[in-house]
Amino acid sequence: MSDNAIRPRPNPWQYIRYCYGARLPDSMRDWVRNDLAGKGAAIRMMIRVAVPAVLVLAPFWLIPTSLDVHLSMTLPILIPFVYFSHALNKVWRRHMLRVHNLDPELVDEHARQRDAHIHRAYIERYGPRPDPND
C-alpha cells in the first residue's frame, strides 16, 4: 500500500477552505505535514495564490482588444501576486504548520536533508562550527 492510500485526505470543500487558511482535523496532520513541508510544497503554495488571481483577471481577456492591451491590463496585477507568493511562501507555510500544531521548522526539512552532505563535507574539512556563546 502506498502512503497516499493510508493517509486521510481532505474532501474538496475542506481542501478549498484549507488552501485559504482553515484548519484541518488532527486526523489529517500527516497529510498537512507532507503538503506544507514535503517535496513540491513551495510550488503548490504559489499555485494556490495564483489561481484566485487568474480567476479575477480572466474576464479582462473577454474584452475585444489587442494582445498588448490584454497583457498590459493583466500582467501588472498578476506579476505582484506571483512575486509576493514566492516572497511570503515560507512565512505562510510556517503559519499553517503552527495552525495545525506542527513544528514550523519542518518548512526547511527538505532543504536540510538535501544539503546534509554539504554540511558534513564542511565539518570534515574545517571541523565543527564554533559555538557563538563561547
From Swiss-Prot:
Keyword set, alphabetical order: Cell membrane, Membrane, Transmembrane, Transmembrane helix
Recorded topology in the membrane: Multi-pass membrane protein
Membrane-traversing stretches: 49-69, 71-91
GO CC terms, sorted: plasma membrane
Pfam families xref list: DUF5313 (PF17240)
Subcellular location: Cell membrane
Protein name: Uncharacterized protein Rv2742A
